[in-house]
Amino acid sequence: ECFIYPHNLGEGKLYGAQENDFNYYKACALSGLGRKEEATELFLAASIGNSQPAAAMYYNDQKPDKIFYQGLALRKLEREEEARGRFNNLISYGEKHLYDVFKMDYFAVSLPDLQIWEDDMNKKNRIHCNYLMALGHLGLGNNEKAMKYFDIAAEMDNNHQGVQIHQKMI
């Protein structure tokens, strides 16, 4: 049911929104039930999409965990080199952009979700970059490093849903 958007929400799925995580978890469930062919199809679906991280400051930007799930799906498909590439992309982006100074760049509906509250966008960027590095290290099995970056992100935003969900994977 996670693939179906209720009509009464007033807005459906955003155009181009990826569902790598949904596909990955459904594939894992099907695999566990012995339905290998169906699982493989969903792992393939989970493995595709934009593999280059971005700032993800706007509500319609691809979230970094989608790339993380691409990597996990590729690993299930025994495409380890490609999987590691996804995880390394997350780490590289986080390291490169950790101290970037954020410059507002929006048009019409892409205004950042919390701009009305005047958030510190540089802080949000640092949280985002630490989260990216945590996901990358988690995917590579570097659990100590992953926990370090999850902890930094959580210290800056203890309500970060991605951190709360993925930190429990360690």
Language-model-detected regions and their locations in the chain:
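"A position-specific structural signal for the A-helix of alpha-solenoid helical repeats
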Residues: 18, 24-25, 32, 69-71, ...
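Amphipathic alpha-helical segments of tetratricopeptide repeats
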Residues: 4-11, 45-55, 91-92, 154-155
